[in-house]
Amino acid sequence: MSGDKPAQPRLVVTLDGPSGSGKSTLARQLARELGWHYVDSGAWYRAVIWAVLESGALTADEAKALELLSQNSFRCQPDGLIAFHGKVLGPEIRSAEIDTAVSDLADLAEVRTAINKTIQKQLQAPQVEGVVADGRDAGSVIFPHAQLKVYVDVPLETRARRRHQQNLDSDIASDHATILQSLTDR
């Protein structure tokens, strides 16, 4: 491979767009239809902050996050879930506590770099034919040479309604007006 093109799976599609636009739903469905790996980069940040908080830290502890990532404790699952020390993480990374802490972690440049490199490394395996990825840095940093990059956008009110319903479906307390304001503030 050329020096400026990082190793990546043979075929990559990335979806980007604002929170609540439906990009994760579309990416997950597309990956399932194609039989490819699905990567939800947002789930990575959630998994890392969950592990940091589980370790006893009270905030987005950069040193602890980097330590956990350097230990190869996290693994991509083909369906987009993340395993930590073999335990597949699900609803525990979608809690209000994680929602509050995850943006602080995502603001840490070294942690973002470490997460992105971990995803790239794990998906370079020859058996990974294709990847559909969405979320932070998917098309710009993780897979900059993706064969197809899609931007998904929908009106703000639709995004708020989708996120509110998603929370309710996951048994997470939710207030439509609060979500609408949060999305507006982003």
Where are these regions (language model features)?
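Hydrophobic anchor at the beta1->P-loop junction of P-loop NTPases
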Residues: V13-L15
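Active-site signature of alpha/beta-hydrolase-fold catalytic machinery across serine-
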Residues: Q29
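Phosphate-binding P-loop
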Residues: D4-R10
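ATP-dependent small-molecule kinase phosphotransfer cores
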Residues: A43-E129, E157-R161, Q165, D169, ...
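P-loop (Walker A) phosphate-binding loop of NTP-binding proteins
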Residues: P18
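Conserved lysine of the Walker
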Residues: K23
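Short, well-ordered beta-strand core segments
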Residues: V131, Q147-Y151
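Hydrophobic positions on the alpha1 helix immediately C-terminal to the Walker A/P-loop
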Residues: L26
